UniProtKB/Swiss-Prot annotation:
The modification Phenylalanine amide is found at F55, F67, F79. One of its GO terms (molecular function) is neuropeptide receptor binding. One of its GO terms (cellular component) is extracellular region. It comes from Caenorhabditis elegans. Residues 20-46, 83-93 form a propeptide. It is found in: Secreted. This is FMRFamide-like neuropeptides 22. Residues 1-19 form the signal peptide. It comes from the Eukaryota. Belongs to the FARP (FMRFamide related peptide) family. Its main location: secreted. FMRFamides and FMRFamide-like peptides are neuropeptides. SPSAKWMRF-amide: Acts as a ligand for the npr-22 receptor in vitro. GO terms for biological process: neuropeptide signaling pathway. Keywords: Amidation, Cleavage on pair of basic residues, Neuropeptide, Repeat, Secreted, Signal.
Length: 93
């Protein structure tokens, strides 16, 4: 009887210790995810024009204006669709 009680206590203590270790891992993971979110926010703050300037390219709107063409969004609006990206996602395969 005493051995079974001791074994039960040991099993309970081991399970509690393992639960705490897993909880610490979860807290560390949450901390890493918060750090990743902060890094992503810093990258998102860059304006689209800064991205195009960084690569030495014209912005997409300037490209369409330069050649006197309609922009892709204007083309889709002419045919009654909301945008090119949504039209692609609505296609049946």
């Amino acid at each position: 009887m005493n051995r079974s009680m001791i074994a039960l206590c040991v099993v309970l203590m081991v399970s509690l210790v393992s639960a705490q270790v897993f909880d610490l891992d979860g807290q560390q993971l949450a901390g890493l995810e918060q750090n990743d979110a902060r890094l992503m926010e810093q990258q998102v703050k860059r304006s689209p024009s800064a991205k195009w300037m960084r690569f030495g390219k014209r912005s997409p709107s300037a490209k369409w204006m330069r050649f006197g063409k309609r922009s892709p969004s204007a083309k889709w609006m002419r045919f009654g669709k909301r945008s090119g990206a949504e039209a692609v996602s609505e296609q049946d395969y």
